């Protein structure tokens, strides 16, 4: 009997859930958010995929979604495990699960997420760490108020500085003199600016173009700074020069100067200029850091060249430790030493992930988001390592009003995750309200096998490993289904970004002798042929371990035609054929990566594949395209009726999915691939017809359709 997903899939229902989940992913699926990972897929969708693949075609999936299930006789394999969404969702449904990823960071994070813990023991460890080093860390984030009272500093504000190559005077690189404003300035127009004369802190408004310093009476335009679009203008001699050219003549990162702080005075936030006490603390930090450096307790690990790291290399950052301030390095070292001493390996992994997780909010590449929101804009806000000229330094231990600190993330990430693991709930929508449905899932306190042999003996229900998924230790024909989310062609190079965390995790956990998580076999290429070849290697291994009646199911989307050709070639050469495709909600519609895309795509395509063989040839090029358009229209209609916005880029995803399924009817791999390579010009007008024919809720419409239909650039 066929599986439900081979016949149908509730794309409207699941996209509605996914839309809601996408806004508060860390609330609705906290187990996958104890640490940063990229391109995390939505748990509600993958629960649906696992459930529809485990269930026969006669099942009532909508009823089963909120019922107790246990598929303990079925084994799921995810060869691109990432943050562990497939592993977790399958485990909740009682499946036996194998997760693997070529990046060692993935296996650390997933093990830490799913392992068994006792909450009271985890709390005891946190209290132990707190008792041992909290006061020491907090002493480095204290300041003295005018009344002589010591208080906590929430954030320090820094600016990069250099000496003008013409007059040699110090020049600060403010992009604007305004350094703090509300995240929604029209709601609260007040702002803070730093005076270019006396460096005092002035009250102003976010759109003000002229203000007078309340201290030294200097008049200035707070909108202006000394750097604009990479060009520096010296305030002393008016000499203009390119920052990138200046950096070529030196071999060190630019220095920073402290210009402001945000403190707590009787629980009230106050912006102040740094005082003598602050510089005394910095002198203490300098002395302690020199001792730490001389003892070589902060190892030098070079930043490797790569698409996502070349930018910071141009700014003369050569090693990962240079991305942190001396104060941050001292505090991180203290936390590392405490966590290293933990005897329980699971607890050590969990607290290592907590420490590693705070690093994205505590480095000199973070900026201030403003009042009225989480204050720290973390280093990966734009999916790249972007050098900032006005960074913010947060309180690493944290206060109740802090953002991204060790103490606050312990509560919001670790404790929330542990609570969810004990009774994983599902999100249900009723009358546009979100409900949590509990007591239907198997708790996520998993016994995790250390090797495949232990897993095969029906002991632990989860087996996690890292390495090339094109070469595994899994038995032939032993897996019931492969469900995964592979990297997309020409997408973010995760390993280049993951090295930022790996530098610290490896010091605590001794993961590997390698200084990088990069691997020659990782499926992350800008070359379509190389991408297809590496993806095919993994899919071929999936074919080997998958039972003959099993299914390979994965999510994918792309705006460029060669991205579709590459993935189809990998599927077919690995011995699979596409039998179904379903467009479904993928990312939050206002996420940075979506908004920055030239052709925004909010949907993923679920591709359902089975092993090829005995296909009957039915070659009619015109019929393939006509059928694909009609089926794509039906799917888009279902989505829009469920109030899911569909962009032109999304329409292409739906159409290409149907084309990939229809192509298999040729029953000739070479003909199929050649047809797909040459069909691009025919797809454009079909896509236009598809959009115009639907009364769609178009996301991010442009002024004219032709501009938005340039989907193959």
Question: What does each of the following model-derived ranges do?
Answer:
Residues 482-483:
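Hydrophobic beta-strand segment of the Class I
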Residues 510-512, 550-556:
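Conserved beta-strand signature within the Rossmann-like core of class I S-adenosyl-L-methionine
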């Amino acid at each position: 009997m066929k599986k439900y997903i081979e016949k149908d899939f509730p794309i409207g229902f699941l996209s509605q859930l996914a839309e809601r989940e996408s806004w508060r992913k860390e609330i609705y699926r906290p187990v996958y958010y104890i640490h940063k990972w990229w391109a995390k897929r939505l748990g509600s969708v993958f629960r649906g995929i696992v459930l529809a693949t485990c269930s026969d075609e006669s099942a009532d999936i909508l009823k089963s979604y909120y019922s107790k299930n246990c598929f303990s006789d079925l084994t799921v394999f995810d060869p691109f495990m990432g943050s562990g969404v497939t592993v977790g969702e399958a485990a909740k449904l009682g499946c036996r699960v194998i997760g693997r990823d070529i990046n060692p960071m993935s296996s650390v994070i997933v093990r830490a997420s799913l392992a068994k813990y006792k909450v009271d023991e985890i709390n005891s460890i946190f209290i132990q760490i707190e008792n041992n080093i909290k006061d020491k860390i907090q002493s480095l984030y204290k300041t003295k108020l005018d009344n002589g009272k010591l208080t906590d500093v929430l954030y320090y504000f820094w600016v990069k500085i250099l000496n003008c190559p013409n007059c040699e005077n110090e020049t600060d690189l403010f992009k604007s003199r305004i350094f703090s404003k509300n995240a929604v300035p029209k709601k609260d127009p007040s702002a803070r600016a730093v005076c270019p004369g006396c460096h005092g802190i002035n009250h102003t408004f976010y759109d003000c173009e002229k203000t007078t310093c309340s201290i030294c009476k200097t008049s200035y335009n707070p909108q202006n700074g000394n750097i604009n679009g990479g060009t520096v203008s010296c305030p002393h001699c008016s000499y203009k020069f390119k920052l990138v050219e200046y950096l070529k003549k030196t071999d060190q990162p630019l220095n920073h100067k402290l210009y402001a702080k945000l403190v707590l005075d009787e629980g009230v936030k106050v912006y102040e200029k740094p005082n003598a006490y602050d510089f005394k603390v910095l002198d203490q930090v300098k002395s302690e850091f020199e001792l730490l450096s001389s003892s070589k307790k902060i190892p030098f690990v070079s930043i490797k060249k790569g698409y996502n790291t070349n930018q910071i290399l141009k700014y003369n950052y050569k090693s990962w430790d240079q991305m942190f301030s001396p104060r941050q390095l001292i505090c991180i070292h203290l936390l590392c030493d405490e966590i290293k001493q933990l005897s329980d390996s699971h607890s050590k992994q969990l607290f290592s992930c907590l420490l590693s997780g705070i690093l994205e909010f505590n480095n000199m590449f973070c900026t201030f988001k403003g009042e009225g929101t989480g204050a720290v804009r973390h280093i990966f806000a734009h999916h790249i390592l972007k050098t900032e000229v006005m960074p913010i330094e947060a309180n690493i231990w944290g206060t109740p009003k802090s953002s991204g600190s060790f103490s606050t993330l312990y509560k919001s990430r670790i404790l929330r995750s542990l609570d969810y693991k004990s009774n994983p709930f599902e999100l249900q929508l009723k009358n546009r309200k979100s409900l949590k449905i509990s007591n239907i899932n198997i708790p996520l306190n998993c016994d995790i096998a250390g090797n495949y042999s232990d897993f095969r003996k029906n002991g632990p229900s989860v087996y996690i490993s890292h390495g090339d998924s094109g070469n595994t230790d899994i038995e032939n024909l032993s897996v019931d289904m492969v469900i995964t989310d592979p990297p997309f062609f020409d997408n973010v190079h995760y390993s280049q970004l993951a090295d930022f965390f790996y530098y610290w995790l490896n010091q605590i956990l001794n993961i590997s002798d390698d200084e990088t998580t990069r691997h020659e076999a990782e499926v992350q290429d800008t070359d379509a042929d190389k991408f297809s070849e590496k993806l095919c290697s993994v899919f071929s291994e999936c074919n080997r371990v998958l039972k003959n009646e099993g299914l390979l199911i994965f999510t994918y989307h792309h705006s460029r035609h060669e991205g579709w050709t590459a993935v189809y070639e990998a599927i077919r050469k690995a011995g699979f054929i596409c039998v179904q495709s379903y467009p479904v909600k993928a990312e939050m519609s206002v996420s940075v990566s979506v908004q920055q895309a030239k052709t925004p795509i909010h949907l993923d395509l679920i591709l359902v594949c089975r092993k090829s063989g005995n296909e009957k040839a039915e070659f009619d090029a015109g019929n393939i395209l006509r059928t694909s358009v009609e089926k794509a229209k039906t799917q888009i209609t279902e989505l829009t009726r469920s109030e899911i916005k569909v962009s032109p880029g999304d329409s292409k995803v739906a159409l290409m999915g149907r084309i990939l399924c229809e192509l298999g009817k040729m029953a000739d791999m070479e003909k199929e691939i050649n047809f797909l390579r040459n069909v691009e010009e025919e797809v454009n007008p079909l896509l236009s017809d598809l959009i115009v024919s639907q009364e769609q809720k178009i996301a991010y419409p442009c002024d004219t359709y032709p501009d938005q239909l340039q989907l193959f650039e």
